[in-house]
């Protein structure tokens, strides 16, 4: 459950390969605006899609949406969207303060350990997944991306909620 929320935060649409490491890129204002322009169409295209069985027709339509919004390819869109999502997942909606991904994972571990409502077997499994994720999660490589996403937060937050990978809940 917690791990899937972390994964959902890193992956914006089902067309992206599950559990792949985010290729960190330096975001531009043009990419943010392109993402904003493409997000609703992408969410609509991938609604109900099976991520394990990509549909070539849907992928072609998604590539056209990406190109229409200034991306060289669907992969280019995916890289930008994953970087945006990774940062959005670390922003507290109330304070607008950013927490690096490793610190987010450490907090999830601490919260889960203290959560009495989660059955022990489930807790043990989720803690193992979070511990494994902690070994691989990396801080944001391009710190200027944080400021760029924060600048556009009010445009991005509703799009994240629509796609099901909204900003993390307030503490």
Where are these regions (language model features)?
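N-terminal signal peptide c-region/cleavage motif recognized by signal peptidases
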Residues: 14-16
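Mature extracellular/secreted ectodomains of secretory-pathway proteins
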Residues: 63-129, 135-141, 148, 152
């Amino acid at each position: 459950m917690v791990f899937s929320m972390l994964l959902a935060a890193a992956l914006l649409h089902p067309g992206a390969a599950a559990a792949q490491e985010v290729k960190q890129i330096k975001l531009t204002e043009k990419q943010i605006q392109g993402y904003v322009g493409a997000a609703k169409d992408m969410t609509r295209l991938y609604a109900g899609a099976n991520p394990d069985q990509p549909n070539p027709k849907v992928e072609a339509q998604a590539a056209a949406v990406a190109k229409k919004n200034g991306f060289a390819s669907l992969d280019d869109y995916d890289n930008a969207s994953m970087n945006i999502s990774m940062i959005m997942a670390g922003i507290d909606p109330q304070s607008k303060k950013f927490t690096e991904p490793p610190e987010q994972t450490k907090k999830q571990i601490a919260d889960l350990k203290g959560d009495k409502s989660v059955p022990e077997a489930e807790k043990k499994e989720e803690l193992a997944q979070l511990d494994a994720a902690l070994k691989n999660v990396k801080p944001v490589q391009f710190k200027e991306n944080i400021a760029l996403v924060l600048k556009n937060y009010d445009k991005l937050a509703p799009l994240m909620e629509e796609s099901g990978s909204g900003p993390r809940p307030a503490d």
